[in-house]
Amino acid sequence: MNETEKSTHFGYQTVPTDQKTDKVKHVFESVAAKYDLMNDLMSLGIHRWWKDFAITQCRLRTGQRILDLAGGTGDLAKRISPLVGDEGEVVIADINAAMLNVGRRRLLDQGIFRNIQFIQADAEKLPFPNNFFDRIVIGFGLRNVTNQLAALQSMHRVIKPGGFVVILEFSKPTLAPLKAVYDAYSFQLLPRLGKLVAKDEESYRYLVESIRMHPDQEALLSKMTDARFEDCDYHNLSGGIVAVHRGYKF
């Protein structure tokens, strides 16, 4: 899709570009309270390993300033916080206030707050100075952004030279037998889980459809290059169900 067009996808629907952000907002307002529980159920807990792997790819050090973009409920930030220490800083930015509220309460309950900030922000127009962060990590958030290229360009602007972005996102299975099983699981079981646990089948149907509409591994790699990231690469996890992309700013 040409991201300058006046329409875009919302799951499998085609909607005016200026309406997608609000539609995604309503989805995450609906699922915020049960989001982490549903992640456990939908991935059978494997999302925890995916996130741990993504954090290892960040190569974090004490004193660094990290942007956890689309960080919502703080599941990545709680892993990052002890690695950068009290001398470091973790900024959790998310466009959705409901997700931030869940994350704020959860991290406070866990005693994780000394080096954490919460900021409501649009990934396409990040409200930070140029060359501000040592690393940016975005987990399962990029596919919900209306203009992904604009978001990647915004990330490139605010990251320091020598820093890099790590993108953890659902992708395309690389094994044909896995794809058939994955499709059946996604379209038959996950919306029903959403209805049973979160009382919201339609929002979880959108989340499944948004995964299918997200660029595959090579297409996202190309988009990162278009945003001026260099030395871009990726690792497939769980047979390509998830991929971790990384791109540098020099």
Swiss-Prot record:
Transmembrane segments: none annotated. It holds the Pfam family Ubie_methyltran. Keywords: Menaquinone biosynthesis, Methyltransferase, S-adenosyl-L-methionine, Transferase, Ubiquinone biosynthesis. Gene3D superfamilies: Vaccinia Virus protein VP39. GO terms for biological process: aerobic respiration; menaquinone biosynthetic process; methylation. Belongs to the class I-like SAM-binding methyltransferase superfamily. MenG/UbiE family. HAMAP family: MenG_UbiE_methyltr (MF_01813). This is Ubiquinone/menaquinone biosynthesis C-methyltransferase UbiE.
